[in-house]
Amino acid sequence: MTNIRKSHPLLKIINNSFIDLPAPSSISSWWNFGSLLGICLALQILTGLFLAMHYTSDTATAFSSVTHLCRDVNYGWVLRYLHANGASMFFICLYLHVGRGLYYGSYMYTETWNIGIILLFTVMATAFMGYVLPWGQMSFWGATVITNLLSAIPYIGTNLVEWIWGGFSVDKATLTRFFAFHFLLPFIISAMVMVHLLFLHETGSNNPTGIPSNTDMIPFHPYYTIKDILGLLLMIMVLLMLVLFSPDMLGDPDNYTPANPLSTPPHIKPEWYFLFAYAILRSIPNKLGGVVALVLSILILAIMPLLHTSKQRSMAFRPLSQCLFWLLVADLLTLTWIGGQPVENPYIIIGQLASILYFSIIIILMPLISLVENHLLKW
């Protein structure tokens, strides 16, 4: 008699995805982030659901409802800070997951990669709308500035912005619809994650060598379930340290001031995980040019498979490409720092140089250095 997990229509899917799934024997801890992202998503949906039970999406009461939650609801502050810092952990895992894909050439699985890019955009949109909900100063002005960027689109821009706002400024209608979308999108993300996994399981996982591992596979359970639990414990430890010791470290103090359309904060900036894109946006003096660069800074990932000129898939044995990769990482950290600084010299010029370097590394230098490496290996 076959095991129920192998014969039951529903359990069979779970079994083939998480238990008997053949996985390469050599995948390192860089492959842990997929499961960590799944846990982050589940945590965000769970904490978000309980937060939504206490939140009111009305400009008059939104700020007070969040304050009430933190002061008067049992462990409400834990829920709130788990959700806020959980988003930070989500993005740390996301960026490491994408970085792993770039380093080891996982983008050659184009379907999985493209769904991943759509997921990244969706998660970013969800996080942006979530930041607006507490209706503090940075929430209001962040929403105003970022939605206003759409007005740079020729001809339809102004109408589009007013349509998104539901009026002539960010107001009650905007807050209500942002709450509706912020609640809905994580469930759409969950469905897209399943599609992401579906495409991944069509090809199987990549591995650090970049060489097909069909001849050397091991079952996902117990080997990688145990390995994933270790990663999970480390992530939960970091998250709890953030939540319990310095819950506001990654937030903005301006968001503890209720939204006031009549007073602009001295430095409007998004959450830390958007600062690199914000720096690229600000580095171009033209509004439309800035918006295009902002979108391209993420969308450029979609052409990675086309820019792959190396005869090897992974960067594991390509020291020159490795140097460029870590230069790209350093450049992104520089952009993140610049995004949080005021618009004045020397920050303006540093931001512009870092933005040029970002696009140059990906579009020009990486494909060129790969060709050089091919030549050095006489391929």
From Swiss-Prot:
<dbReference type="InterPro" id="IPR048259">
    <property type="entry name" value="Cytochrome_b_N_euk/bac"/>
</dbReference>
<feature type="transmembrane region" description="Helical">
    <location>
        <begin position="178"/>
        <end position="198"/>
    </location>
</feature>
<dbReference type="GO" id="GO:0045275">
    <property type="term" value="C:respiratory chain complex III"/>
</dbReference>
<keyword id="KW-0830">Ubiquinone</keyword>
<dbReference type="InterPro" id="IPR030689">
    <property type="entry name" value="Cytochrome_b"/>
</dbReference>
<dbReference type="InterPro" id="IPR048260">
    <property type="entry name" value="Cytochrome_b_C_euk/bac"/>
</dbReference>
<keyword id="KW-0479">Metal-binding</keyword>
<dbReference type="Pfam" id="PF00032">
    <property type="entry name" value="Cytochrom_B_C"/>
</dbReference>
<keyword id="KW-0249">Electron transport</keyword>
<keyword id="KW-0472">Membrane</keyword>
<feature type="binding site" description="axial binding residue">
    <location>
        <position position="83"/>
    </location>
    <ligand>
        <name>heme b b562</name>
    </ligand>
</feature>
<keyword id="KW-0812">Transmembrane</keyword>
<feature type="binding site" description="axial binding residue">
    <location>
        <position position="196"/>
    </location>
    <ligand>
        <name>heme b b566</name>
    </ligand>
</feature>
<feature type="binding site" description="axial binding residue">
    <location>
        <position position="182"/>
    </location>
    <ligand>
        <name>heme b b562</name>
    </ligand>
</feature>
<feature type="transmembrane region" description="Helical">
    <location>
        <begin position="347"/>
        <end position="367"/>
    </location>
</feature>
<dbReference type="InterPro" id="IPR027387">
    <property type="entry name" value="Cytb/b6-like_sf"/>
</dbReference>
<dbReference type="InterPro" id="IPR005797">
    <property type="entry name" value="Cyt_b/b6_N"/>
</dbReference>
<feature type="transmembrane region" description="Helical">
    <location>
        <begin position="33"/>
        <end position="53"/>
    </location>
</feature>
<dbReference type="GO" id="GO:0008121">
    <property type="term" value="F:ubiquinol-cytochrome-c reductase activity"/>
</dbReference>
<dbReference type="GO" id="GO:0046872">
    <property type="term" value="F:metal ion binding"/>
</dbReference>
<comment type="subunit">
    <text>The cytochrome bc1 complex contains 11 subunits: 3 respiratory subunits (MT-CYB, CYC1 and UQCRFS1), 2 core proteins (UQCRC1 and UQCRC2) and 6 low-molecular weight proteins (UQCRH/QCR6, UQCRB/QCR7, UQCRQ/QCR8, UQCR10/QCR9, UQCR11/QCR10 and a cleavage product of UQCRFS1). This cytochrome bc1 complex then forms a dimer.</text>
</comment>
<feature type="transmembrane region" description="Helical">
    <location>
        <begin position="113"/>
        <end position="133"/>
    </location>
</feature>
<feature type="transmembrane region" description="Helical">
    <location>
        <begin position="288"/>
        <end position="308"/>
    </location>
</feature>
<keyword id="KW-0999">Mitochondrion inner membrane</keyword>
<dbReference type="InterPro" id="IPR016174">
    <property type="entry name" value="Di-haem_cyt_TM"/>
</dbReference>
<dbReference type="Pfam" id="PF00033">
    <property type="entry name" value="Cytochrome_B"/>
</dbReference>
<keyword id="KW-0679">Respiratory chain</keyword>
<dbReference type="InterPro" id="IPR005798">
    <property type="entry name" value="Cyt_b/b6_C"/>
</dbReference>
<protein>
    <recommendedName>
        <fullName>Cytochrome b</fullName>
    </recommendedName>
</protein>
<keyword id="KW-0496">Mitochondrion</keyword>
<keyword id="KW-0408">Iron</keyword>
<dbReference type="GO" id="GO:0006122">
    <property type="term" value="P:mitochondrial electron transport, ubiquinol to cytochrome c"/>
</dbReference>
<keyword id="KW-0349">Heme</keyword>
<comment type="similarity">
    <text>Belongs to the cytochrome b family.</text>
</comment>
<keyword id="KW-0813">Transport</keyword>
<feature type="transmembrane region" description="Helical">
    <location>
        <begin position="226"/>
        <end position="246"/>
    </location>
</feature>
<feature type="transmembrane region" description="Helical">
    <location>
        <begin position="320"/>
        <end position="340"/>
    </location>
</feature>
<feature type="binding site" description="axial binding residue">
    <location>
        <position position="97"/>
    </location>
    <ligand>
        <name>heme b b566</name>
    </ligand>
</feature>
<feature type="transmembrane region" description="Helical">
    <location>
        <begin position="77"/>
        <end position="98"/>
    </location>
</feature>
<keyword id="KW-1133">Transmembrane helix</keyword>
<feature type="binding site">
    <location>
        <position position="201"/>
    </location>
    <ligand>
        <name>a ubiquinone</name>
    </ligand>
</feature>
<dbReference type="GO" id="GO:0005743">
    <property type="term" value="C:mitochondrial inner membrane"/>
</dbReference>
